């Protein structure tokens, strides 16, 4: 899935769109996506000016965006202006490696369970072979007025 397809699926735009490409997707099972991290990211201006590091919360957000793409594919729906995909919870978040300009984040997200409109995912983000972040994510899709 290229960036044009991602833009049709996710409502996020610059500077918060954190998925550049989907490398693999298995409906109802898993997704593998990537984010190219460059020095041009706006968060590096303040985090930290003399030693730029990607904020951990944005690694979690990148995994959540990949999870949303998997959820939409699994349900066979295309989101619209009346559908919002929310975080419902994060458990066991661990940050194991700093992510710096020039790194490529690979997000591997697995759908663990789907029940009553709540999705539970297991996500691992890597740079090369090294784990940068891992967490369990809970998300829900809601219709808004």
UniProtKB/Swiss-Prot annotation:
Catalytic activity: a (3R)-hydroxyacyl-[ACP] = a (2E)-enoyl-[ACP] + H2O
InterPro entries: FabA_FabZ, FabZ, HotDog_dom_sf
Entry EC no(s): 4.2.1.59
Main localisation: cytoplasm
A GO cellular component annotation in the UniProt record: cytoplasm
One Gene Ontology MF term: (3R)-hydroxyacyl-[acyl-carrier-protein] dehydratase activity
Catalytic center residues: 47
Pfam families: FabA (PF07977)
Subcellular location: Cytoplasm
Coiled coil location: none
GO biological process terms, semicolon-separated: fatty acid biosynthetic process; lipid A biosynthetic process
Keywords: Cytoplasm, Lipid A biosynthesis, Lipid biosynthesis, Lipid metabolism, Lyase
Function: Involved in unsaturated fatty acids biosynthesis. Catalyzes the dehydration of short chain beta-hydroxyacyl-ACPs and long chain saturated and unsaturated beta-hydroxyacyl-ACPs.
NCBIfam families, per database record: fabZ, PRK00006.1
Name of protein: 3-hydroxyacyl-[acyl-carrier-protein] dehydratase FabZ
Lineage summary: Bacteria, Pseudomonadati, Pseudomonadota, Betaproteobacteria, Burkholderiales
Gene designation: fabZ
